[in-house]
Every structure is written in C-alpha cells, then in structure tokens.
C-alpha cells in the first residue's frame, strides 16, 4: 500500500486539526484511554516545533505579496517599453553622430581641395644655397612643406577674411563720411553767406597811458543856449544835470568801432558739372570759350579721347578745344587731317 505525499498546506491543516482536537479533549476531560496514553506518549519537542513552524508560516504569510497575472503583464509591458525607448534613442544618437562625422569629413575634403597652393619661390644664390643645392630633395619633404603651407593658410583663413571685411567696412565708412561732410560743407557755406562777422576795437588800448581829463569847475557859466548853438542839440535841465555829473567823473571813455568783415568769396563752380568744387581746383580754358574757367581735376578732359588732362603739365588747343598731346599730333600734325566719326560722335555728346 502506497501513500501519496500530501501538500504542505494539507499537512499543516492536519497537524492543526490534531492539535486542536487534543487540546479540546484535554479541556473537556473526554477521550479514550488509548488516546490519553497516546497523548501522554507525544514528546514536548514536537509541539514546540509545530508551534514554531506555525509562527514562521504566519510571518511569511504577512510579508508575502500576492500578484495576479495582469500585474505581471503590465510590469512586463513597462519594462519592454522602457528598453525599446532606450534602444531607439541610442540608434538616433548614433545616426546623428554618424551624419555629423560624414559632414565634417566632406567639409574637410572640400576645404583641402580649395586650398591648393600655387606660387613661385625666388632664392638668392648665396654661398650657403650653392653649397646646399646639390642635396637631394625627396617628395616627402616637398609634401611636408605643402602640408605646412596648407595648415598655415587654414589657420589664417578666418583672420584674413575678417581683416578684409574690416578694411571694406572702414573704406565704406570713410566714403560715407566724406559725402556727409560735403553736404554739411555746402550747408555751412550757405549759412556763412547769411552771417555777418563784426570786429570790436577798443580805444584807447588798456596798456596805453590814459590822459587825465581837466577838471571842470562846478560853477560853469556856459549856458544851455551856447550848447544848443555850438552842437545843434536842444538842451534841457535834465541833460544839463547829466552833463555836469559826467564832467565830474574821472572814468576814461572808450569808443566801440564796429567794422563789418567782407563777405566770404563765392564757392568755385565746375564748368563741366555745374557743382561746387570741394578740394583741388583746375583753372584752364574751357571748350568753346575764350576765357579760363574752373574745373574738377577729373572733369577737364581731352575732346577726342575723353581722358583727364590733370596729369599733364600742358595741353594742346585747336579751335577753342583742348586736346592731349597724342590726339593733337594724331589729328593736326600738318601732314594729313581728316576728322573721323569718333570725333564727330564726341562733339555731338558735348
């Protein structure tokens, strides 16, 4: 006869039922003699072990957390989602880094192709060079020199570009400043024409010795009629008292002389563009005119070739028209003269 093993919880229930039945029989005093003998035959360590086992099972049941299948599935989904998101982020970051490296490699390759060095080197034939020129120069040395030149150009590329930009900005600023100063100069000239300048002169000068005026006695017998007859001024009692007080004053008199300054000369006007000349003025015979006029240095030109004549000390004149030396000898050299179409078109433009 075989006995199948029982689960642990069934064994626990059987032990618990046996112990409870025994305790109830002892309390009520019932039971067979065989049972009493059997109870008395059970040793105390067994009960002790059973009680300890029961207490341990209770503590383990308190700490045990029961979870169903749904909770396990939700936890698996959360873990799987987190791992999937981390995997996607790592793949995207790797792709971005790869693209950046590819772009940098392409830019470096493009920069190297654009920074090719072409030039000429001149060497003075000194004794040291003559002694060292027989040495063999390998291709590696030349490549090293070229690489060094390219690196220097690559390092100084930004600096040279910024320097060129600064130079262009400064040049543009200078041009604008000159233009603004020219407009302000025109307005200033107009204002100066409207203003009048006065010069004050004090006489006598402070450093000169002031002569003492003779004292007039108070009992002056000169009548008001005498003043009126001598100076042509109608005298009254108030003017007579004022004259007497002024006569008693010893303060020297000073006279203010106001003399108007001459107006500023008119600004020179170019005979070619009819604008005021600010700067160097060129005075020469105007085309089709019998008197000299003023020009900008770049507006006095040859009638034929339309080149400025400001760089030449002299020029040639024919039929009241200025010519440079080359055009004059080409057209009017005395051997043959035939005005061409180019000169006719220039005259039409003039």
UniProtKB/Swiss-Prot annotation:
Disruption phenotype: RNAi-mediated knockdown leads to disorganized actin-containing I band filaments, disorganized dense bodies in the muscles and reduced motility. Its main location: cytoplasm. One of its GO terms (cellular component) is focal adhesion. The keyword NAD does not apply. Residues 268-334 form the LIM zinc-binding domain. It comes from the Eukaryota. Ubiquitinated. Ubiquitination by rnf-5 leads to dissociation from muscle dense bodies during molting and is required for ecdysis. It is a peripheral membrane protein. Residues 1-37 have a biased composition (Polar residues). It is found in: Cytoplasm; Nucleus; Cell membrane; Cytoplasm, Myofibril, Sarcomere, M line. InterPro entries: Znf_LIM (IPR001781). Residues 83-110 form a coiled coil. Residues 1-65, 177-198, 206-225, 235-262 are annotated as: Disordered. Residues 45-65 have a biased composition (Basic and acidic residues). It holds the Pfam family LIM. Expressed in the body wall muscles, vulval muscles and the anal muscles. Expressed in the muscle arms of the head muscle cells that form neuromuscular junctions and in the anal depressor muscle. Keywords: Cell junction, Cell membrane, Coiled coil, Cytoplasm, LIM domain, Membrane, Metal-binding, Nucleus, Ubl conjugation, Zinc. GO terms for molecular function: metal ion binding; protein domain specific binding. Required for the assembly and integrity of muscle dense bodies, which establish the adhesion sites of the muscle cells to the extracellular matrix. Decreased localization of unc-95 to dense bodies and their subsequent dissociation plays an important role in ecdysis during molting. Involved in the organization of the muscle sarcomeric structure and thereby required for locomotion. This is LIM domain-containing protein unc-95. The lineage of its organism: Eukaryota, Metazoa, Ecdysozoa, Nematoda, Chromadorea. The gene is unc-95.
């Amino acid at each position: 006869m075989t006995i199948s093993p029982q689960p642990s919880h069934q064994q626990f229930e059987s032990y618990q039922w046996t112990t409870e039945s025994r305790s109830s029989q002892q309390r009520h005093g019932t039971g067979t003699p065989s049972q009493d003998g059997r109870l008395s035959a059970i040793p105390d360590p067994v009960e002790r072990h059973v009680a300890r086992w029961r207490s341990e099972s209770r503590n383990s049941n308190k700490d045990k957390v029961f979870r169903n299948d749904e909770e396990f599935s939700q936890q698996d989904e959360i873990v799987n989602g987190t791992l999937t998101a981390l995997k996607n982020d790592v793949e995207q970051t790797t792709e971005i880094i790869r693209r950046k490296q590819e772009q940098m490699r392409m830019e470096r390759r493009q920069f190297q192709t654009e920074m090719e060095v072409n030039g000429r080197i001149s060497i003075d034939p000194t004794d040291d060079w003559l002694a060292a020129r027989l040495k063999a120069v390998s291709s590696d040395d030349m490549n090293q020199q070229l690489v060094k030149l390219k690196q220097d150009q690559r390092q100084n590329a930004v600096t040279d570009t910024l320097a060129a930009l600064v130079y262009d900005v400064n040049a543009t600023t200078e041009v604008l400043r000159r233009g603004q100063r020219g407009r302000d100069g025109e307005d200033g000239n107009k204002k100066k024409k409207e203003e009048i300048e006065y010069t004050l002169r004090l006489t006598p000068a402070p450093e000169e010795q002031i002569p003492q005026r003779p004292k007039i006695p108070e009992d002056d017998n000169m009548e008001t009629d005498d003043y009126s007859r001598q100076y042509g001024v109608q005298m009254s009692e108030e003017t007579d008292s004022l004259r007497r007080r002024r006569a008693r004053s010893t303060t020297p008199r000073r006279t203010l002389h106001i003399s108007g300054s001459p107006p500023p000369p008119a600004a020179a006007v170019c005979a070619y563009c009819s604008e005021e000349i600010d700067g160097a003025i060129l005075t020469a015979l105007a085309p089709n005119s019998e008197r000299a006029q003023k020009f900008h240095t770049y507006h006095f030109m040859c009638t034929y070739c339309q080149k400025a004549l400001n760089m030449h000390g002299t020029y040639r004149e024919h039929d009241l028209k200025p010519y440079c030396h080359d055009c004059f000898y080409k057209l009017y050299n005395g051997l043959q003269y035939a005005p061409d179409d180019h000169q006719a078109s220039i005259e039409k433009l003039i």
